[in-house]
């Protein structure tokens, strides 16, 4: 039996593509437009990121560029995956949906988690993670979902049966789909918790980055709670399952771009603020001053209160003196102006003898 071609679609087009052009079901065209705009925006950010590398003054912001590029790849994949849910479910779109949905979101949430971990150190004035460590954390966290998805696909498809997803009943398919995303839900909770820790610190400049992650995760959690709730409702019309999932993909993709990518790009070229780091000058750092026992320990002694100072060797310690201590001056040599003296006459004795003779 021949099916009627919907208004807006050309003749000879396969029925699974009708949602892309059917004017009667406008949601497909709307989501297609939103997803296409997201793809273009993501590509624009990815092309802009290498150009901004030379303009980033802060080395710790520059360390995040590879991880943020990986994040943009995940966002680009999310917008691209939206088309797999607009197109009808069959042997090709079924494995794609189950395999890529969790992997792409695990990449995005892992990048946000790695960024949040680095921010928890920066906001407390500690040494941040290196570029390779941040990128390694993001890749490592996302690989777990890859293993889970591959194992599920292989076991479910039994290696060759690609139509198994379309053959499953809608409730069973939805349950398997949500259970497959258990690790992604764990990543979301962990990232949200870690982003809240970025508000606990004395260096407020890095809290703005933490606020971007916190807001992104808060909105993402709201979207996920909404679509999982609708998908698991027993009395809900199952014809809208693809609409719910494709809408969740497009909405979450734009949340990533507007709540995280855009403000982060705006902060990339911001001038390095010295207040965002611990003071490196030793003069300004609090230090342990060597105790001067002659000053502090003798300042309130009863003897010095009465005498005013105490002599120890050649140094006088005053109770409230500075570190320039008083010292005894060496005794000065006495001198006097020479005066004229009358010398006794050599004939004094002679004259006395003469008179006595």
Swiss-Prot record:
Modified residues (Phosphotyrosine): 317, 320, 347, 350
Ranges annotated as spanning the membrane: 34-54, 69-89, 98-118, 130-150, 177-197, 213-233, 248-268
Subcellular location: Cell membrane; Cytoplasmic vesicle membrane
Modified residues (Phosphoserine): 301, 345
Topological relation to the membrane, as annotated: Multi-pass membrane protein
Entry GO MF terms: cadherin binding; G protein-coupled receptor activity; protein kinase activator activity
Post-translational modification: Phosphorylated in two conserved double-tyrosine motifs, Tyr-317/Tyr-320 and Tyr-347/Tyr-350, by EGFR; leading to inactivation of the tumor suppressive function of GPRC5A in lung cancer cells. Tyr-317 and Tyr-320 are the preferred residues responsible for EGFR-mediated GPRC5A phosphorylation.
Assigned keywords, A-Z: Cell membrane, Cytoplasmic vesicle, G-protein coupled receptor, Glycoprotein, Membrane, Phosphoprotein, Receptor, Transducer, Transmembrane, Transmembrane helix, Tumor suppressor
Tissue: Expressed at high level in fetal and adult lung tissues but repressed in most human lung cancers. Constitutively expressed in fetal kidney and adult placenta, kidney, prostate, testis, ovary, small intestine, colon, stomach, and spinal cord at low to moderate levels. Not detectable in fetal heart, brain, and liver and adult heart, brain, liver, skeletal muscle, pancreas, spleen, thymus, and peripheral leukocytes. According to PubMed:10783259, expressed at low but detectable level in pancreas and heart.
Inducing stimuli: By all-trans retinoic acid (ATRA).
Assembly and binders: Interacts (via its transmembrane domain) with EGFR.
Function: Orphan receptor. Could be involved in modulating differentiation and maintaining homeostasis of epithelial cells. This retinoic acid-inducible GPCR provide evidence for a possible interaction between retinoid and G-protein signaling pathways. Functions as a negative modulator of EGFR signaling. May act as a lung tumor suppressor.
Protein name, as recorded: Retinoic acid-induced protein 3
Organism of origin: Homo sapiens
Gene: GPRC5A
């Amino acid at each position: 039996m021949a099916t009627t071609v919907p208004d807006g679609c050309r003749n000879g087009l396969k029925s699974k593509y009708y949602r892309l052009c059917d004017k009667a079901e406008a949601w497909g065209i709307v989501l297609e437009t939103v997803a296409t705009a997201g793809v273009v925006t993501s590509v624009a950010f990815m092309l802009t990121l290498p150009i901004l590398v030379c303009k980033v003054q802060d080395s710790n912001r520059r360390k995040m560029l590879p991880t943020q590029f990986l994040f943009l790849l995940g966002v680009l994949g999310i917008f691209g995956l939206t088309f797999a849910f607009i197109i009808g479910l069959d042997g090709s779109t079924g494995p794609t949906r189950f395999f890529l949905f969790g992997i792409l979101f695990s990449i995005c949430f892992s990048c946000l988690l790695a960024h949040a971990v680095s921010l928890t150190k920066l906001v407390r004035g500690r040494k941040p993670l290196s570029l390779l460590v941040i990128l390694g954390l993001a890749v490592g966290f996302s690989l777990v979902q890859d293993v889970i998805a591959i194992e599920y696909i292989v076991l479910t498809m039994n290696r060759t049966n690609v139509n198994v997803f379309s053959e499953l009943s809608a409730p069973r398919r939805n349950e398997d789909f949500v259970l497959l995303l258990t690790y992604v839900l764990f990543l979301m909770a962990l990232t949200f918790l870690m982003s809240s820790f970025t508000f606990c610190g004395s260096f407020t400049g890095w809290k703005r980055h933490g606020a971007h992650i916190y807001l992104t995760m808060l909105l993402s959690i709201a979207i996920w709670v909404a679509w999982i709730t609708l998908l698991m409702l027993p009395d809900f019309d199952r014809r809208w399952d693809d609409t719910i999932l494709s809408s969740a993909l497009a909405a979450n993709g734009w949340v990533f771009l507007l709540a995280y990518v855009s403000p982060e790009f705006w902060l990339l070229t911001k001038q390095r603020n010295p207040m965002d780091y611990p003071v490196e000058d030793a003069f300004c750092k609090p230090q342990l001053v060597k105790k001067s026992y002659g000053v502090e320990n003798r300042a309130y002694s009863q003897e010095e209160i009465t005498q005013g100072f105490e002599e120890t060797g050649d140094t006088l310690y005053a109770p409230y003196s500075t570190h320039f201590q008083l010292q005894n001056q060496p005794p000065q040599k006495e001198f006097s102006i020479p005066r004229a003296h009358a010398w006794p006459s050599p004939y004094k004795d002679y004259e006395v003898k003469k008179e006595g003779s």
